């Protein structure tokens, strides 16, 4: 049976450390990290994600400002809101819960955030610094994955890391991070996507397999080798009348069968999700203490 990479437990340890750092800041009379979260519309999944982020902030002692706009909000209104949040010196981090309604240009909205407050790490300024291996905000989910690999001391140097999914929030940035000259990193990376032919030929070569496509049960036991470390980023709501909430969460990996063969695996839920939030909090603390671009306060 595979080693379970318990993101929920590791995230708990990270939040404890963050809470201690916040207490130290308070004792020294320094600003407490303050995160602004903007939600547009009434998507149930987005509401759940935002609730979990606000709850985590409260647990570690961060201040939060939650702003919800109607799904028909004008793009110009959203841009003005971000402008005001940028100008507010008491706010250290800003996140826009994705996805946004189709009439709003998500890229334009993200680019409007001041890079030092872009704690989701999606601004092109931060993305470019990440690509150059310079200090910056790293996108939350890839950072969470790196922290998880580091906690479990998963060897990455010289390993073949196969990433399925080339999205801008997970697959694309993680491909850069896993090939950088650092730990975790120094891996040989293969990035697969919807046009990749004979996917199994690649997954069977993977020492580290990261799946982030949102297709439940895509990866089965016959697609991996026994020594593989599997990171399942996918999370899909499957209708289930036996559950009180009416659905269950399923990842991109057929967990039960793959876990009997692989070396290590993240569960869904309880794997990458909690680590993403822990990484977001980490970025926010760094923003509050001016450590984003390697300029810590004295």
Curated annotation (Swiss-Prot):
Any one GO molecular-function label of the UniProt entry: methylenetetrahydrofolate dehydrogenase (NADP+) activity
Record keyword Amino-acid biosynthesis present: yes
Protein's recorded name: Bifunctional protein FolD
Biological process (GO), any one: tetrahydrofolate interconversion
Family recorded in the similarity comment: Belongs to the tetrahydrofolate dehydrogenase/cyclohydrolase family.
Gene encoding the protein: folD
PANTHER family assigned to the protein according to its UniProt record, in alphabetical order: C-1-TETRAHYDROFOLATE SYNTHASE, CYTOPLASMIC, C-1-TETRAHYDROFOLATE SYNTHASE, CYTOPLASMIC-RELATED
SUPFAM superfamilies: Aminoacid dehydrogenase-like, N-terminal domain, NAD(P)-binding Rossmann-fold domains
Pathway this chain belongs to: One-carbon metabolism; tetrahydrofolate interconversion
Signal peptide stretch: none
Role: Catalyzes the oxidation of 5,10-methylenetetrahydrofolate to 5,10-methenyltetrahydrofolate and then the hydrolysis of 5,10-methenyltetrahydrofolate to 10-formyltetrahydrofolate.
Origin species: Amoebophilus asiaticus (strain 5a2)
Catalytic activities: (6R)-5,10-methylene-5,6,7,8-tetrahydrofolate + NADP(+) = (6R)-5,10-methenyltetrahydrofolate + NADPH; (6R)-5,10-methenyltetrahydrofolate + H2O = (6R)-10-formyltetrahydrofolate + H(+)
Family annotation (InterPro entries): Aminoacid_DH-like_N_sf, NAD(P)-bd_dom_sf, THF_DH/CycHdrlase, THF_DH/CycHdrlase_cat_dom, THF_DH/CycHdrlase_CS, THF_DH/CycHdrlase_NAD-bd_dom
Subunit (UniProt): Homodimer.
Positions of NADP(+) binding: 165-167, 194, 235
The protein's Enzyme Commission number: 1.5.1.5, 3.5.4.9
GO CC term (a single one): cytosol
Keyword field: Amino-acid biosynthesis, Histidine biosynthesis, Hydrolase, Methionine biosynthesis, Multifunctional enzyme, NADP, One-carbon metabolism, Oxidoreductase, Purine biosynthesis
Pfam families membership: THF_DHG_CYH, THF_DHG_CYH_C
């Amino acid at each position: 049976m595979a080693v379970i990479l318990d993101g929920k437990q590791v995230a708990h340890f990270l939040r404890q450390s963050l809470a201690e750092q916040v207490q130290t800041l308070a004792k020294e009379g320094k600003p407490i990290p303050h995160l602004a979260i903007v939600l547009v519309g009434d998507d149930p999944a987005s509401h759940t994600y935002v609730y979990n982020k606000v709850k985590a902030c409260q647990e570690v002692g961060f201040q939060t400002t939650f702003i919800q706009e109607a799904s028909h909000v004008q793009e110009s209104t959203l841009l003005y809101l971000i402008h005001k949040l940028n100008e507010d010196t008491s706010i250290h981090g800003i996140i826009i819960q994705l996805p946004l309604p189709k009439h709003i240009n998500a890229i334009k909205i993200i680019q409007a955030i001041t890079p030092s407050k872009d704690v989701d790490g999606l601004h092109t300024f931060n993305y470019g610094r990440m690509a150059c291996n310079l200090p910056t905000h790293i996108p939350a989910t890839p950072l969470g994955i790196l922290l998880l690999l580091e906690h479990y001391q998963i060897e990455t140097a010289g390993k073949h890391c196969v990433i399925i999914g080339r999205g801008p929030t997970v697959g694309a940035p993680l491909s850069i991070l896993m090939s950088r000259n650092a730990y975790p990193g120094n891996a040989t990376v293969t990035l697969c996507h919807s046009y990749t032919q004979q996917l199994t030929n690649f997954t069977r070569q993977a020492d580290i397999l990261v799946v982030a496509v949102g297709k439940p049960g895509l990866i089965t036991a016959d697609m991996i080798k026994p020594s593989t470390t599997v990171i399942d980023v996918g999370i899909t709501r499957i209708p289930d009348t036996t559950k009180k909430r009416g659905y269950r969460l399923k990842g991109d990996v057929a967990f039960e069968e793959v876990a009997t063969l692989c070396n290590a695996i993240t569960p869904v839920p309880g794997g990458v999700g909690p680590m993403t939030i822990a990484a977001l909090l980490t970025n926010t603390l760094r923003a509050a203490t001016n450590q984003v671009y390697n300029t810590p306060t004295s």
